[in-house]
Amino acid sequence: MGGCPVRKRRRNGSKEGNHHSTQPKRNKRNPIFQDSQDTEFSWSDNERSSSRINIPERASGPEGNLNQIVTEPDANFPQFLHEGLSKPVYVINWFMSFGPEIKLNTSQQGRNQAV
């Protein structure tokens, strides 16, 4: 049984006697698969204002308080977070984190006012 001799690889990865040219690996990432952190969104003032929901200035009940928190900047509310709330993903994440606290606080305020 005479087999073909096994050829050892050289350090550069090519086989002896192999006439194929080696191509360098590409380090560029496919733009389709970029991380969302790498992508920066820039919204013009027109787009930002048209994406907001028009809410009456004085809404009654706890829902009005929640809407006020989302749409109006407050001294106790970090500016970077308020700017992020113009994007739906940030709004959802923010309410997932702080929604239960806000609901609890507004229901306690309602009890205090009723007493």
UniProtKB/Swiss-Prot annotation:
- Where are the compositionally biased (Polar residues) regions? 33-44
Superkingdom of this entry's organism?
Answer: Eukaryota
Q: According to the UniProt entry, which residue ranges have a biased composition of type Basic residues?
A: 1-12
Where are the stretches annotated Disordered? Answer: 1-70
Q: InterPro entries from the xrefs?
A: VCF1/2-like
Q: Which Pfam families match?
A: FAM104
Family, similarity comment: Belongs to the VCF family.
According to UniProt, the name of this protein is: Protein VCF2
* Species of provenance: Homo sapiens (Human)
Organismal lineage: Eukaryota, Metazoa, Chordata, Craniata, Vertebrata
